Amino acid sequence: MVGKKVVLVVGTNGYDNIGAAVVQKFMTEGWHVVTADIRDDVDIYLDVTKKASVQDAFKYIKDTYGRLDAVLPCHGVNILGKIEEYPEDHWDKTIDINLKGLFLLLQAYVQHFDNDGLRKVFLPITSDTAEIPKTSTFAYGASKAGANHFLRCTARELNKYHKDPWLVSGLAVGMVAGTPMDKKTIADLVAQRDISEEKARSMLTANIPLGRGLTTDEVAEWMYFTATKGDYSSGCILRIDAGQCQG
């Protein structure tokens, strides 16, 4: 078993996303970081929608490092569209990646690492869209609402009936500026509503009291703090949205 704490960060697509910032933060704090995504430039190829792929990844980590102190799912997909035109495969893809993926990840984490005597953290990025209705985001919102309740239920189960201490929680972030998902959302709004990029961004920030989106570094700081200090938040969904939830 390696001496350093080991963290698996899922979803590190590109340099400007949440996962990349989380990787940098945990590396700076001295953790051994294992990156996973559906690309070749990561430590482990991992398709969160395929059980065999997920199981292989966790087996590799156990065989290689002997421990896994935290799993931080930062992956996600948001495909906007009108309900009357929305393709079924877009719905399936959204649910599979955003919700089924969490089930497969946590299941594998428990199966491979439970009862090793170590504290464990499962802390995905969810979304304020789980609670705040937004036009054209019904699939994404439904997947994130399901994710939130999945985390609440499994936190209760793992802490009540398992010996090891588990922190199972979620960070429900608001708009994170400059990420690939943010850029795609703006592009979709521009195309669907025939508006300018400036207008699309003002629509997205209109209800945020601070008047801006989060930065990826801010999300990474919150994730590190919660993962290391947030034991009593297990089962809670932590809203990081600059007061947007207050209206």
Language-model regions: role of each:
Residues 74-79, 243:
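Conserved NAD(P)H cofactor-binding loop of Rossmann-fold oxidoreductase domains
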Residues 106, 143:
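Active-site helix of classical SDR
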Residues 82-83, 90-95, 204:
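Substrate-binding pocket helix/loop in short-chain dehydrogenase/reductase
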